[in-house]
């Protein structure tokens, strides 16, 4: 798979709720630097996996709507909106946030991420 295809696999519908999928696509030494509306986070592999677990507990569906995706060698940039459906209200789709992320891949896995998000 190309770097772009690997990133698309990571953001396909419901993938962020699936520990197995996320784990398979993350490099062992992955680091995600995330600037959110709540502040700065620097996440390692286990912390990213913990977020996946928490998302799976809170939401029954996760949908990523990618508006832009660009690939240059082992680097992929993605602009997307993340929508979810809650267990309490499965018919209503809610916007979680808008995201822009640049992923560097190593050995066909997500290695370094630089992400910004805003609700």
Task: Tell what function each PLM region has.
Residues 26, 82-84, 101, 117:
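Short beta-strand segments enriched in hydrophobic/aromatic residues
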Residues 33, 79, 113-114:
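Beta-strand residues in well-ordered beta-sheet regions across diverse protein folds
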Residues 1-25:
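Short acidic-aromatic low-complexity motifs
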